[in-house]
Amino acid sequence: MNKILRRGIYEEDINFVGMLLFVTCTAQAAVPEDSAAFHDKYQLQKMLVLSRHNIRSPLGETINKLTPHKWVKWTSAPGELSQKGGELETIMGQYFRERLVHDGLIAENEQPAAGKVRFYANSMQRTIATARYFSSGMLPVANVSIEHQFAPSQMDPVFTAAFTFMNDAYQAKVMQQIAAKGGKNGLRGIGSGLADSYRLLEHTLDISQSEVVGSKGFKGFCTDDIAIVLENHKMPYVLNSLKTAISASDALVLQYYEEEDPVKAAFGHDLTIEDWKEISKPKDNG
């Protein structure tokens, strides 16, 4: 069995790359639902899994100025995998171990020979750590090495969504496609679509009492100031209200997963699941 696990990729038998994706020797699309009859008829031979890192701490310190409240005490440095993220990723690995043992792709407590299993991760602390926790759950008695191209923390080009080509015509085409997401109003339409999220973010953060309002003159998230920058050899990035809202949205959602009490996670506000979905929109669409 020649396996390459690449938090990354398992080529030949199993692949682990980013969001969960299963590939069998047949087309699952032909089967409307997961059924016992299907499993009796087909044998899993290969699997490809694409996965991002698990829960991390927020990326920057801007969030401290957006609310008068204290954020949770993060268990890791900014942008690094949190303790909760490690726990959850171990559980994820255990789930895959049970599934793969059940389907006969690996043995219980398998110890693959050297070189038969490879874990390849992006060279960020959060991704290397995610791969390590996942491997401990999936292969708990195996001495697995985690491969990465650079010393932490540097982005591996394999995983970087940076432009490798740019000219005026291409830039205009990309901007046109982005603006189309806002309908006939273009970028303003994107901003308008986030209006409810912006207001809920302001309310949850109690942003009117924050440092950014008191010292910076910030008056709230605007729906009409979206700016997008496209440059060669860089990832696309946004400016102004959406940039700040993405940071706030990201931090609140991470706090929701890190803090067991959802009311505490929302700084004393009793939010519904639908509210949390609304809060997550800026980071999901940004």
Model region roles, listed by residue range:
Residues 4-16:
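Bacterial N-terminal signal peptides that target proteins for export
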Residues 29-116, 122-286:
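Signature for phosphate-centric chemistry
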